[in-house]
Every structure is written in structure tokens, then in C-alpha cells.
């Protein structure tokens, strides 16, 4: 039976996958893909069929079991393969997940480059994207406070192009030679291997204080950017400065950006902490779930461009990876769109073995003298050799879709068989020739831009690299009030975990006082550092667009792909339940039924003799409010049961404390009011009135609900007057931060 079910599921999956056209890369991978659900007999790795894989060959008789025999080559192979399944994990970005998709160019930038992927709007370029955390090991949690990796591999007709980016546009260091020291400092401390996947320890904060260049970056790391709600709701940045070269040989400096269609949203810190234990796979499951439900994540692809002749026109060095190019100075130009639409078939050979290199560029794109990029170009290629071997680019997930032919040979795990008698250039057959400089340009070989270089060989950076505070101030000034509040709390949490007074006293009392005095004073008071009396550097007061996440709310409110919990017990109101569930699905969101049990639950007026009931997706003890974007409780007699359950009340309180939308109808309105009214004057709908009331993101409607109150198709508007419209609008805003700013959330125990 299990085999039949598995086979049926697999066939259904195949049908779904075959309904859409496959990209060149997916077709390429098919030759290395095997079906694990087939009835084909089990074999050894050398192709011999296996008759028994459950018992080791041994000496036995009727009375006892004797010794196992070493001659059992099948058992030995099975154990040998198991013993060698693991490979070295990535030193950084070890914890990650990935998906396939497509990149579509919307606007040709032929004025800037001759790269086909950025000039040919008829192309649909296959991509593989890997999201990751930076600090933790493969087994760490998804929701830690950390930078997120956002690496994109384009399988272009001219070769693979990798944008090895992050969800934060700057980095901690300017020069790649400091990378080993930085990673040593951010990783668990060497004497006890503690803490895992956290910056909240002495060594990290010691390092960043002693490296003022890290100031801008750690401001980002203490912001909400470091605890994203979803990989689908975070920006991506190329971090480094690259160059674009056009057919005329003119060079422009460029930075790459990814902007999510769903907006840029984050968890709250208490929620992130709890999810680390409740669902450590939260982000990877969220991505897979969205793709499985055809809520395909999308990002706009944008560039910032500076002509070569204007390189020196800014107060900062445009090659400094610890600096952004403010958008009011260098506007974004949106030119394409990325969509992720297929999950991996097997994690290890695809997500774990995928390898990205900043040195993977295609003709029309070039490197710059960005000192961090220069070192990354060496390090990334080198680390792939360590992890995967010298022939790592022959692995299915890494190989290009365009022809590959050269004179490279041999090495461990070489796959390709090359015919012919020569393996060098030049050769008497003129076989496999380089294109030469005449072949550069569109469709030709890679040609390095002929950059003029002059200077003195020494170990130094130019003068503009020495300024480290202006953009840190710019970032903090640009935050909204709730974002600033979250940053104060983040610094206070992190430095509270530092037990060396030298570390937290100078960071709070000195470095932060160079950014913002009020921030420094608040953090110093919380962590027990001397409170600075004056700013150590005058704040310039400038702000910049698109640094605050509040500027990325979608223009048209949407709840697409949002996870909404509906809590029910025996005796729930079927009208409100069915009406809202239907409306949620119609809005492309995901309803999850949370029951008092995961067995049949009956609506008001039903029992097992008159109805099959509803089987919930989960029971309340198997999930937590942290795993959902909003919660709805319909009315009905079941509320009497819910009222007696402390965990349900905690669910309500936690939803409120985490600033999420909370909806209730009928008898459930009083349950919500009772739960939250300990210290609050909760404003809810009258128990007899169906007119909806919205109060700090809590949407209620009293009385018995009528079917016409729940429209299947709802236009989500700020001024909606119906219950569903009001509730959906609150969900679309992600969180009700005014609830926090007015001090309401802090009065609730959660």
C-alpha cells in the first residue's frame, strides 16, 4: 500500500512538473537524474542486483547467531558509502537552502554592456538561487540574527555568471586579507565552541570595535534586516562593485540589487528566538511551501551605474564594500525580474554541492579594484576545490548549459572524457583555439578592460577608505521609529551576552556615541556601561531613501502566500469558518486549521452522525503562533472550550505581542477581549453587532455571522468597511508597529 501511495504521489508530481516548459538547465540535469520511486530492483554501485539488504552475511544455526563475515561485499559497500557521505561544510554560509527559477530581462542595457544576459530581452535565463545564514553550522537554526546569503547562478548562453550577494548591501571589512580574522571572531569562541550562530559574544564585538570600518555593517546587522520574515521578503545585493563594458569599450561601475515583490519584512526578536527552537527549519520550509503552492517568489533586478569618469565625484570611495551608493545620488534602474518556481529534487547534489564564485563572470562584465572583491575572487574558487575537488565545475548543478571545451585535464573525480591526441595550445591541429582579441564583444571571448593603473606598491588603501561614520549615521537616521527601537533592543541584547566589561563598555559608551547619542545612552544604561554625556561625533542629520524597510510595502496591498491560522474546536461557527477560509484561498494566502485535536471536529449543530467533520491541519500543541502571520477565531459554542485552555489564551497574547493581525467573530470576540484586557482597554465590536471594529490590528465583529459578510473576492484597501477587508488589510501591512510604539505590546505576557 505504501509503495502504491508513494508511486501515485510521484506520478502526480511528474504531471505537475511537466505542465510547464523546462529550462535548459533542468533539461541538462535530467541525464543525471534517477527515479527513486521505480520498481527497478536494488543494485550495488557496480550494478549487481541485491537479493537481501537487511541482514549481514553470517554463520548461524537453529540455536544461535554466529559471527558476521567480512566477505560480505554488499554489506561492506553499504557501510563504506555511509561512512563517507559527509563532505566539508562551507566555512561560512553552511546553513542554506535553494531553488530553481528563471531570469527575464525586461530592458536591454546595451548602452552599458555587451553581455547577452543583460542585452537580449528574448532570453529566459535559467538560474539557481541559494539563500543562507553566514555564521552557523549546517545544523543551526534559520531564524538567528545574521546576514543572509543571496547567491544567484545564471546559466547563460555565454557561461555561468554568479552574483554572490547578501541581504545587506555592505560588509564588515574593506580588505579581504582581514576575512580570516573576521570569521574567526564571529564564529564560536575557540576555547569552548560557544555560541553557535550568534554575534552575541565577546570576540565579535571586540573585533568590530577594533575595526571602525565595521561600524556601518554592524548597524545593519542590529537592524530588522538581520531577522527576515522569509527569504522571499528580503532584498539582495551584490555588495561588491563590478564593471560593465559596452561594445564601444566604455566602462561603467555597477552595483546589483534584488527587490522582492512581496516587500521587505522581518520577524520580531522574541519571535525569532522562539522559532529557533520551535521550528529551526522555518525559512527553508517557507520557501518550499510557497513554491509548492505556486506562490512563486519574485524579485525585480536593478542596477546602480556610475560612469568611469565620475568615479571620484563622491565623498566615499565607490570601491569600498563598507559603503552604499545612496539612491538619491545614484538612482536604481530596474531592468529585469527573477522568479523561483521549482524546488530541488535532492538536497545534497543540488543545494549542498552548488558552488558560487565571484570570479564567474561573462563577457561584458568585469572586475574592479574593489579590495574585498579581489580577495573573494581568489578565496571562493579555492574553497570549492577544498570542499568538492578540482573538478567541481563538472558536477551537474555547477556545469554550464553552453558548450565547455578546453585543455584542462585529469584531477580527482574527472567525469569528462576528451577525445584527441593533443591537450595543449598551440597545437599542430589548431584545435580548441582561443578567440583572440578579434573575437571579443558580442558572442566572443572574455576580454579584460584595458584599465590604466599607476601608483606605488604598498600595503595601504586610499584616503576615502578611512572614513567610517557618515554612512552608519545615515543608516540610523533613515530608520523609522519602530526600527530604531528594535535596534536599541538588539544592541542591548547582544552586549548583555558579553561578560568582558572592556567589550561592552567601549562599544556602548564610545562607538555608539559616535553614531547617535540617544542610542548610545539607552544601550549603555541597559548593559551597565558608563553613560556618555555627549556625542563623540556630531550626527550630520542626513537621511537616504530605501534604507528603511517601511519604504518597501507593496503599492497594492496583498496577503499572497501569508500563513493564516484558524483556531477551532467542536461547535465552531461554520459560516465564519468557511467564509474566511474561502476568502483566504481566493487571496492566494494559505489557511491552516488549528484544532483542539487533529481528529474530526464538528461545526455547531453537527456531530458524527450528521457530518464527517473537518480534520485540522494541526492541533494547537503541535504548532505555535510564531509560525503564522495572523490568527482568526470564529465564534460558536466552541469558544467555551477554548476559554478553558491556557495555551489558546497564550496563542492570542503572543499574536498580539508579536504585533500580528488578530481576527475574531461572534463569541470569540469576548475571548479575545478577556485575554488582552488585563492591563489594556481593548476596543472590540459589540457582542450583538456584526459591524466590524479595528483596534491596533485586532479586527472583530460581533453577533451571528451571515454568509454575505464573507465575500470570496476581497479588494484589500486601507479604508475597507467589511470584516474580511479590514482583517486582510491588517495582514497585508505585516505588523501593527503602532501597537508597540504606544506601549501596548509590552503590557502583555507572552
From Swiss-Prot:
Gene Ontology CC: cytosol; peroxisomal matrix
Catalytic residues as annotated in Swiss-Prot or TrEMBL: 93, 166
Keyword list, A-Z: Heme, Hydrogen peroxide, Iron, Metal-binding, Oxidoreductase, Peroxidase, Peroxisome
Any GO MF annotation of the entry: metal ion binding
Main localization (coarse): other
Alphabetized Pfam families for the sequence: Catalase, Catalase-rel
Region (Disordered): 30-49
PROSITE patterns for this protein: CATALASE_1, CATALASE_2, CATALASE_3
Chain positions recorded as heme binding sites: 380
Cofactor dependence: heme
Subcellular locations according to the entry: Peroxisome matrix
GO biological process, one term: response to oxidative stress
Catalytic activity: 2 H2O2 = O2 + 2 H2O
Gene3D superfamilies: 1.20.1370.20, 3.40.50.880, Catalase core domain
Residues passing through the membrane, by range: none
Entry's EC annotation: 1.11.1.6
Keyword Repeat attached: no
Family: Belongs to the catalase family.
Function: Catalyzes the degradation of hydrogen peroxide (H(2)O(2)) generated by peroxisomal oxidases to water and oxygen, thereby protecting cells from the toxic effects of hydrogen peroxide.
Name recorded for this polypeptide: Catalase A
Organism: Aspergillus fumigatus (strain ATCC MYA-4609 / CBS 101355 / FGSC A1100 / Af293)
